[in-house]
């Protein structure tokens, strides 16, 4: 039986059970079969089939399809319906669609499918490279990739700069998909040794027109040189380029041009309400502040042309508190701060974000109500991308553009060529509020804010000056003085790139002859030239010291202290003496050919007030730059005050003898002065008497109140619980009152009143005399020894009694009462 059982059990173990290796092989076989079916379905797929409406209609692997379902992506958009089938077939694509139409999924799905069909693993290296022009857009693409690719086994990385290059380099070798910006990627291709891109399968350029423009052209050219030519390339943007040079640069092979809205009436979404406002440059900030005050319950993005403008408007509006949360974002911020601000604005229900074009392309902020372009964009494409931050995914949105009067005609013509409809609106006068005075006050209080305002002015004017489209941007028509005043600046900052007449060249034109003659004479005499490396004294070094503050040089340039140097190409300092010149007679003689007087030079003399300053050394030349040191040569200022008649008079004005004599005889003036002072004394005496009378009255009232209080205490002590006190001494007293009864009734410090302990009958003895006060009752924690100790301590103090006084004695009666209390046993 046992053997049989053993045999039966052995036979049971020998049945065919699949091993692990068999399970893996079966799984691999099923995967190959599924992959073969997918490839066959892709070959049979018609890209222009109208039946393709959802992601389930596409031949996608289960990992991608499940990721799309989990992320709630079901229906295909127009650009996805046109681009994904072609990309699955391996074609190069040029995709163009309106903002917010789903271009990100149009290239992420082909990327995942491309690597899945190639059976890509972590050991195969980099398979897909996605390039974005901005860090914010790259982060957004990476987050979408993580959502839809959660079921794949590919490793993905984000390389956008702002972090340690060494840490990124250590992880690059293990990445299959990289989302990056052009500059950082090129840096890794040049410096990271173990980074290999020879097996790259697919290259994606999001916002390709921005990447291909002059700002990134050199980086893209260098980056493409590292990539293999057998790759598949996908280019997507809201405004696509068809230039042959761009296509040849990226080695595109027979690209398919996909435009989901090529036949559309407008290049912008139909549910986007667009308008523009013509506002002078000096009223731009006033209009913007009024706009924010009227849209407090909205989510707004305000675009400026430079980061300095963003910082100034944010800092100044933050002080004025328009009533809406404010944020700012520009390219000079740290990456951590940029990501935090992006996250805060995305999750906010209401708020205003001041930003540059770093968020103008591709970045998806949910539920944006308004897009305000405070500065005119450089072209129509930039306008389309900016307004694309609202009205995304069939939602509604509104956009408004601020145009300067000189920019209106030219820019509207550019927008008409791009099929962008705009409606002109006017600003209500009651909604305008001038903030110029407030900004000027803030600039006066904060030098840093004033510096930001100056830099904002310069950055804006520089951007206008460097624009290529001169039909739209005319620098000479700008009201620079009014714009500077609207920023709260006291004066218009100097602009170096605003060319004018070369004043220094014109000023020195008549001195050319004397300068050349003096140089030739010095050469003939054989005088040695000044050695640049000669030893300088410590005083000369002290005279050449400059302020090392980081803002000092900027302040000098902005305030125009460099003088003519701001309008010329030279960097020479203002009032720097180049050469000690002769007087006018010698200059005229030198110009006429008389070279005999050119060698005789005299020190230059400058008149400062009533004194003269002789410039005969380098130290005196440096003295001209110091206003503080020049004060001692100037006239001393006089301080004036205005009298009641509005006449300006010196602070210390003394009368002379003649002026005093005109007023009359001295005796009469003396009597007049004494009479006037007597009247003042009489008036003051009346007030003093009234004050003394009030003090006496208050004193009497206090005394009466004190007496009433003492009477009430005496009645309470004798009555024993509310009874009437007995004022006579009983039968044996014969009606005579005790004169010290009142004094004995005064409370003594350290003793308690016995009133209220018993009735009136208990306080009197059989003989009619008042009993002495009882001893203090013992507490529950005291015994006889404690009470005896207290009595002993009182005797040691000499039996001194302390009488509490409410106030100091004021008359004889008070003193007698006090003495009687002290003498009483």
Swiss-Prot record:
Enzyme kind, highest EC tier: hydrolase
Chain intervals with Acidic residues compositional bias: 730-739, 761-770, 805-816
Main location group: nucleus
InterPro entries: DEAD/DEAH_box_helicase_dom (IPR011545), Helicase_ATP-bd (IPR014001), Helicase_C-like (IPR001650), P-loop_NTPase (IPR027417), RNA-helicase_DEAD-box_CS (IPR000629), SPB4-like_CTE (IPR025313)
SMART domains, sorted: DEXDc (SM00487), DUF4217 (SM01178), HELICc (SM00490)
Keyword check for Magnesium: no
Binding site for ATP: 97-104
UniProt keyword terms in alphabetical order: ATP-binding, Helicase, Hydrolase, Nucleotide-binding, Nucleus, Ribosome biogenesis, RNA-binding, rRNA processing
One GO cellular component term: nucleolus
Segments of skewed composition (Basic and acidic residues): 19-34, 677-691, 700-714
Domain Helicase ATP-binding: 84-258
Catalytic activity: ATP + H2O = ADP + phosphate + H(+)
Keyword Transferase: no
Superkingdom, taxonomy of origin: Eukaryota
Documented EC number(s): 3.6.4.13
Motif (Q motif): 53-81
GO MF annotations, alphabetized: ATP binding; ATP hydrolysis activity; identical protein binding; RNA binding; RNA helicase activity
Domain Helicase C-terminal: residue ranges: 284-439
UniProt short sequence motif DEAD box, positions renumbered to this chain: 206-209
CDD domains the UniProt entry points to: DEADc_DDX10, SF2_C_DEAD
Its biological purpose: ATP-dependent RNA helicase required for ribosome biogenesis. Involved in the release of U14 snoRNA in pre-ribosomal complexes. Required for pre-rRNA cleavage at site A2.
Domain remarks in the Swiss-Prot or TrEMBL record: The Q motif is unique to and characteristic of the DEAD box family of RNA helicases and controls ATP binding and hydrolysis.
Self-association state and partner proteins as the record states: Interacts with the U3 and U14 snoRNAs. Associates with pre-ribosomal complexes.
Protein name: ATP-dependent RNA helicase DBP4
Protein encoded by which gene: DBP4
């Amino acid at each position: 039986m046992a053997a049989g059982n053993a045999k039966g059990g052995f036979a049971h173990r020998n049945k065919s059970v699949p091993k692990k290796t068999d399970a893996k092989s079966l799984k691999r076989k099923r995967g190959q079969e599924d992959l073969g079916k997918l490839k066959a379905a892709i070959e049979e797929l018609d890209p222009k089939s109208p039946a393709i409406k959802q992601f389930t209609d596409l031949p996608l692997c289960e990992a991608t399809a499940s990721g799309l379902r989990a992320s709630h992506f079901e229906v295909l958009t127009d650009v996805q319906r046109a681009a994904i089938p072609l990309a699955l077939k391996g074609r190069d694509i040029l995709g163009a669609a309106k903002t917010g139409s789903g271009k990100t999924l149009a290239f992420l799905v082909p990327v995942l499918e491309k690597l899945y069909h190639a059976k890509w693993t972590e050991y195969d290296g980099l398979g897909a490279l996605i390039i974005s022009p901005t860090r914010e857009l790259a982060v957004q693409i990476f987050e979408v990739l993580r959502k839809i690719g959660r079921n794949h086994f590919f490793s993905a990385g984000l390389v956008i700069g702002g972090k340690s290059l060494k840490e990124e380099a250590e992880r690059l070798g293990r990445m299959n998909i990289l989302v990056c910006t052009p500059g950082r990627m090129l840096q890794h291709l040049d410096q990271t040794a173990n980074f290999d891109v020879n097996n790259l399968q697919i290259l994606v350029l999001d916002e390709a027109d921005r990447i291909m423009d002059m700002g990134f052209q050199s980086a893209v050219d260098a980056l493409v040189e590292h990539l293999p030519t057998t790759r598949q390339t996908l280019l997507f943007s809201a405004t696509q380029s068809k230039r042959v040079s761009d296509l040849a640069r990226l080695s595109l092979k027979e690209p398919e041009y996909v435009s989901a809205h090529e036949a559309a009436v407008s290049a912008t979404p139909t549910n986007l309400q667009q308008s523009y406002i013509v506002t002078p440059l000096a009223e731009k900030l006033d209009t913007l502040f009024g706009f924010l005050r009227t849209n407090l319950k909205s989510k707004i993005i305000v675009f400026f042309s430079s980061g300095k403008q963003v910082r100034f408007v944010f800092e100044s509006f933050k002080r004025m508190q328009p009533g809406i949360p404010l944020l700012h974002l520009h390219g000079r911020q740290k990456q951590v701060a940029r990501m935090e601000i992006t996250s805060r604005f995305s999750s906010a229900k209401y708020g205003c974000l001041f930003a540059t074009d770093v968020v103008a392309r591709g970045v998806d902020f949910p539920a944006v109500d308004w897009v305000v372009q405070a500065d005119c964009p450089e072209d129509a494409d930039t306008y389309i991308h900016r307004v694309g931050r609202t009205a995304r995914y069939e939602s509604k949105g509104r956009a408004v553009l601020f145009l300067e009067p000189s920019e209106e005609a030219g820019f509207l013509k550019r927008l008409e060529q791009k099929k962008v409809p705009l409606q002109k609106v006017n600003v209500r006068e009651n909604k305008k509020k001038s903030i110029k005075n407030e900004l000027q006050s803030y600039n006066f209080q904060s030098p840093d804010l004033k510096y930001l305002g100056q830099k904002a002015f310069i950055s804006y004017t520089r951007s206008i000056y460097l624009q290529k489209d001169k039909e739209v941007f005319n620098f000479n028509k700008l009201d620079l003085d009014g714009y500077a005043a609207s920023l709260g600046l006291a004066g218009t900052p100097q602009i170096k790139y605003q060319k004018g007449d070369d004043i220094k060249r014109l000023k020195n034109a008549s001195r050319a002859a004397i300068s050349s003659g003096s140089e030739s004479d010095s050469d003939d005499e054989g005088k040695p030239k000044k050695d640049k490396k000669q030893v300088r004294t410590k005083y000369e070094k002290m005279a050449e010291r400059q302020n090392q503050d980081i803002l000092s040089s900027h302040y000098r340039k902005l305030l125009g202290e460099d003088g003519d140097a701001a309008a010329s190409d030279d960097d020479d300092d203002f009032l720097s003496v180049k050469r000690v010149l002769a007087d006018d007679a010698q200059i005229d003689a030198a110009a006429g050919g008389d070279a005999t007087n050119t060698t005789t030079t005299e020190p230059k003399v400058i008149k400062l007030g009533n004194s003269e300053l002789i410039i005969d050394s380098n130290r005196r030349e440096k003295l001209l730059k110091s206003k503080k040191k020049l004060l001692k040569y100037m006239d001393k200022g006089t301080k004036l005050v205005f009298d009641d008649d509005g006449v300006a008079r010196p602070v210390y004005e003394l009368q002379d003898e003649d002026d005093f004599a005109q007023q009359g005889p001295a005796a009469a003036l003396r009597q007049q002065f004494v009479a006037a002072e007597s009247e003042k004394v009489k008036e003051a005496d009346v007030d003093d008497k009234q004050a003394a009378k009030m003090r006496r009255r208050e004193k009497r009232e206090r005394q009466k109140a004190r007496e009433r209080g003492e009477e009430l205490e005496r009645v309470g002590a004798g009555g024993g619980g509310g009874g009437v006190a007995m004022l006579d001494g009983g039968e044996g007293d014969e009606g005579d009152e005790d004169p010290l009864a009142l004094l004995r009734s005064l409370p003594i410090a350290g003793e308690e009143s016995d009133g209220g302990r018993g009735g009136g009958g208990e306080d009197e003895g059989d003989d009619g005399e008042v009993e002495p006060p009882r001893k203090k009752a013992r507490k529950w924690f005291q015994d006889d020894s404690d009470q005896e100790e207290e009595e002993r301590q009182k005797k040691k103090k000499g039996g001194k009694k302390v009488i509490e006084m409410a106030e100091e004695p004021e008359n004889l009666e008070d003193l007698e009462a006090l003495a009687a209390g002290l003498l009483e046993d």
